[in-house]
Amino acid sequence: MLLIGEYNSKLTDKKRVAIPKKFREIIGNKMIVTNGFEGCLIIVSEKQFEDITNDITVGKFVNNDIRDTTRFLLGGACEVDLDSQGRFVLPSNLLDYAGINEEMCFVGLKRWIELWSKDRWDEKKKQISSNASEIASRLETVKD
């Protein structure tokens, strides 16, 4: 099954986040949350995180871009276990990085979830919408 869709949520007073049920059913109760690109967070299963980081670290250790990307993704990462209601506590360093104060949005992107502050997501969505056909035409040359 694919992680798809957009779900709005709110941070609780105790800084807990509830993962949407449809996402929990796919990703499970143990996951990794880390810094994402463009000011959001990335939520993935432990297995998916291992696959992503293996793809990055297969390069040469002497390459600064590889080391910096590894620092960015692994240095900010935390393992989380969901409680019986599908919630976990989001550490303050990740809340600060993503600018999440209260309202947030989960966005399913096939193999991972992005977690955005509602304001940042609304702005990003406008930006994408206004350039969607241009972006899609550039992707014609990109291969998996």
Task: Outline where the language-model segments fall.
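Flexible "stalk/tail and boundary" regions
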Residues: M1-S9, D13-K14, K22-V80, S84, ...
